[in-house]
Amino acid sequence: MSLEPFIDSKPFTFGVELEMQIVNTHDYDLTKAGSDLLRLIKDEKIPGNITPEITESMIELSTGICTTHEQAVTDLRKIRDTLVSAADHLNVGLCGGGTHAFQQWSERQIVDTPRFQYLSELYGYLAKQFTVFGQHVHIGCPDPNSALYLLHSMSRFIPHFIALSASSPFVQGVDTGFHSARLNSVFAFPLSGRAPFVLTWDSFEEYFSKMVHTGVVNSMKDFYWDIRPKPGFGTIEVRVMDTPLSVDRAAAIACYIQTLARHLLLDKPIAPQEDDYLVYTFNRFEACRFGLAGTCINPQTGERKTISEDILETLDLIAPHAEALGSGNALAEIGAIARGQVNDATWLRGVVEREKSLHEAVRQQCLQWRA
């Protein structure tokens, strides 16, 4: 199978995908209601899509093509409200969060589609353990070489995206000590991690052809990279974020990525090189484990900062691009998160400390999602 052509798209347009938890309203464990939700909303007119995910306890919502923060917030709220109304009809709850706090992976049911059943057969128990919930952001790119440049220059900021969105401190009833434990489930897959260091589309097509020839992959969907090109959309897809607890937070993070992309493609402040990845795994671990208080090493200068400090310096740097895109409110929210060092994982731990109940924490996650 050959790689599909890269469809040039309007630069700095973006789309948001959110994988959602479906819970019962008795003890707030995950419940099997994905197919029922889809049946209820199939005729609803929404500014995007709602699709199944790998298990019946998940569902994915996605916006259409957005250009501004205001549009993203408006569209996400409309889709959320449609889903919440359907969930209320079924007496189930919806919430964000990168992991469910106490679900048991062995109880999950794989959705009956050819691809999901294939993944279940291929990956065994990992497929059910993949009942984790992420935010993906697509960024429009004018041509394929620009997409690869943006992919590799954007990798420098992966710790920012992880720490800002982190909302998965609990797994199977245990505080993991991580801010984003979700990504530990992703790392178990053999084709996860970072994309290969190639900067031209011809080289990428050659790499893809070799991988297809080995029989390891059939399409781009088989790569679980932190950032991957999406040729059919004309985008790169940033995939490291936990699903935030609110659509407003998700929109703010998406617009931070959009604004960074404009800075990187127009100003070209980074000349990507293979050695940039020497600290990549360390930086990613620090963000997952310690969140905004983690250490971030600049791969080109070797300078160490906390991730929150690095975010605040980056916000100053990209301020002119925020003004051009109309994303000032989004970046103000990002700045507030970084200064306060309070992401959703911190909030969840606070709820559990006060209430002494993971069930109550999930209930409050549902309230956050509706707000």
Swiss-Prot record:
It catalyses: L-cysteine + L-glutamate + ATP = gamma-L-glutamyl-L-cysteine + ADP + phosphate + H(+). PANTHER family: GLUTAMATE--CYSTEINE LIGASE 2-RELATED. It comes from Paraburkholderia phytofirmans (strain DSM 17436 / LMG 22146 / PsJN). The keyword Nucleotide-binding applies. GO terms for biological process: modified amino acid biosynthetic process. Signal peptide: none annotated. This is Putative glutamate--cysteine ligase 2. Keywords: ATP-binding, Ligase, Nucleotide-binding. The lineage of its organism: Bacteria, Pseudomonadati, Pseudomonadota, Betaproteobacteria, Burkholderiales. NCBIfam families: gshA_cyan_rel, PRK13516.1. Belongs to the glutamate--cysteine ligase type 2 family. YbdK subfamily. It is an enzyme of class 6 (ligase). ATP-dependent carboxylate-amine ligase which exhibits weak glutamate--cysteine ligase activity. GO terms for molecular function: ATP binding; glutamate-cysteine ligase activity. InterPro entries: GCL_type2/YbdK_subfam, GCS2, Gln_synth/guanido_kin_cat_dom, YbdK.
